[in-house]
Amino acid sequence: MPKRVLQGVVVSDKQDKTIVVKVERRFTHPVMKKTVRRSKNYHAHDENNAAKVGQTVFIEESRPFSKLKTWRLVEGEARDVAATEA
């Protein structure tokens, strides 16, 4: 089975070799028929401490690194949101 890959924004990089990534999903509400946004935070392993707050990154499923970390940063995929908007 292929590993899931999610795209999100780094909201914290204060921990050593760990980042917190906010992943947003959109879906249509079954009754109201309105597009709803829901977000969830994932702890991901960042071996080289490469990702910084505000960057858009891709994370993929992996073996458990700790109690909360079961995702890892996909190398070479970090993109700075502030630089692309300016």
Swiss-Prot record:
Pfam families attached to this UniProt entry: Ribosomal_S17
Keyword Flavoprotein: no
InterPro entries reported for this sequence: NA-bd_OB-fold, Ribosomal_uS17, Ribosomal_uS17_bact/chlr
A single GO BP: translation
NCBIfam families per record: PRK05610.1, uS17_bact
Quaternary structure (record): Part of the 30S ribosomal subunit.
Protein name as catalogued: Small ribosomal subunit protein uS17
Primary gene name: rpsQ
